[in-house]
Amino acid sequence: MNLSLPLHAYLLVAFGSGLGGAARLWVSTLVSRGTGTAFPWGTLAVNVAGCLIVGIMAALFEPASPLHVRQDLRVLLVVGLLGGFTTFSAFSLETLLLIQRGAVAAATAYVVASVALGLLAASAAYMSMAAALR
């Protein structure tokens, strides 16, 4: 199986990721200015917005969609833009697809494992780095 992609696909992802990352910073900062930083409202807003957008895009980009969206546009917007904006959108879409396929147990395990392992990784990395900096 050949998994190589053409150079333009990588360039589309890079461009979209840059825009998505800048958008994430802007939205998160804007929300945090209005709500404060005691709770990560900015990040929550970005993650929920990303999930909303990926849901819309997934529906629009379905093979049965009358739009007939090119693969390049999907790569730019979903992998690049939303990948830069938030990877939580991909996580949510993957969970939704598992549920739609009837794999509710797998979807549940994926959610629990993603959250638990994400928190564990963040905690371990934070504590390790804090200890190394002392």
Model segments located where?
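Membrane-interface helix-loop junctions in multi-pass transporters/channels
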Residues: 1-134
